[in-house]
């Protein structure tokens, strides 16, 4: 039985990135009717930033951790269980100031953990999330695709691909709805604007 982890990071319920993850999940469930979907909306309970206790706990063998250290890692452990359980990830992300939303960065800091999502072998890091698939479902107000003048300002999917690759995820797809600032124009039909992107989402999820 396949399992999909859906991550949402936009604070807006009507955001384009959520429309993309909605469409991905619907198409994925149609293709995998017996599959399980784990939903993690990071905006409902934003992860806290890591602190000295958290860092110390990560580098302390589990049997030697204090109650405070175990408590500090509890949320991270829950995130990691979802990552390890899932076969595929659907990551909904809107571009914020040329990169990812702060809440998604907080989640990343909680899940990049030595001994859980990566380890060192012969002095080199090795990702432990092998055999997983990820789809980055991005929404950007401007257009930052390859060959455009603003291409070099896109730190969203290059960063996420770097993080996922570091953790061992090699099968990564990116579907981007670019130029979404046009939707602020009342003369632009949202459904017609998004349909070509949603079609790519459906094809990717199937």
UniProtKB/Swiss-Prot annotation:
Its cofactor is FMN. One of its GO terms (molecular function) is FMN binding. The keyword Oxidoreductase applies. It catalyses: 2 a quinone + NADH + H(+) = 2 a 1,4-benzosemiquinone + NAD(+); N,N-dimethyl-1,4-phenylenediamine + anthranilate + 2 NAD(+) = 2-(4-dimethylaminophenyl)diazenylbenzoate + 2 NADH + 2 H(+). SUPFAM superfamilies: Flavoproteins (SSF52218). Its EC number is 1.6.5.-, 1.7.1.17. It comes from the Bacteria. It is an enzyme of class 1 (oxidoreductase). FMN binds at residues 10, 15-17. Binds 1 FMN per subunit. Keywords: Flavoprotein, FMN, NAD, Oxidoreductase. Gene3D superfamilies: 3.40.50.360. It holds the Pfam family Flavodoxin_2. InterPro entries: Flavodoxin_fold (IPR003680), Flavoprotein-like_sf (IPR029039), FMN-dep_NADH:Q_OxRdtase_AzoR1 (IPR050104), NADH:quinone_OxRdtase_FMN_depd (IPR023048). PANTHER family: FMN-DEPENDENT NADH-AZOREDUCTASE 1, FMN-DEPENDENT NADH:QUINONE OXIDOREDUCTASE. Belongs to the azoreductase type 1 family. Quinone reductase that provides resistance to thiol-specific stress caused by electrophilic quinones. Also exhibits azoreductase activity. Catalyzes the reductive cleavage of the azo bond in aromatic azo compounds to the corresponding amines. Homodimer. This is FMN-dependent NADH:quinone oxidoreductase. It comes from Acidobacterium capsulatum (strain ATCC 51196 / DSM 11244 / BCRC 80197 / JCM 7670 / NBRC 15755 / NCIMB 13165 / 161).
């Amino acid at each position: 039985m396949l399992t999909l982890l859906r991550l949402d990071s936009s604070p807006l319920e009507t955001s384009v990135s959520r429309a993309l993850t909605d469409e991905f999940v619907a198409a994925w469930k149609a293709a995998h009717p017996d599959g399980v979907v784990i939903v993690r909306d990071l905006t409902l309970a934003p992860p806290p930033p890591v602190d000295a206790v958290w860092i110390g706990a990560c580098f302390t063998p589990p049997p030697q951790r204090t109650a405070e250290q175990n408590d500090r890692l509890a949320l991270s452990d829950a995130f990691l269980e979802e990552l390890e359980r899932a076969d595929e990830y659907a990551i909904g992300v809107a571009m914020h100031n040329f990169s990812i939303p702060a809440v998604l960065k907080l989640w990343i800091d909680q899940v990049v953990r030595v001994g859980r999502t990566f380890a060192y072998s012969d002095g080199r890091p090795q990702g432990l999330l092998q055999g997983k698939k990820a789809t980055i479902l991005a929404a950007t107000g401007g257009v930052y695709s390859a060959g455009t003048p603003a291409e070099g300002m896109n730190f969203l999917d290059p960063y996420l691909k770097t993080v996922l690759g570091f953790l061992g995820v090699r099968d990564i797809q990116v579907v981007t709805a670019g130029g979404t600032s046009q939707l602020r124009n009342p003369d632009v039909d949202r459904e017609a604007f998004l349909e070509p992107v949603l079609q790519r989402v459906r094809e990717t999820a199937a």
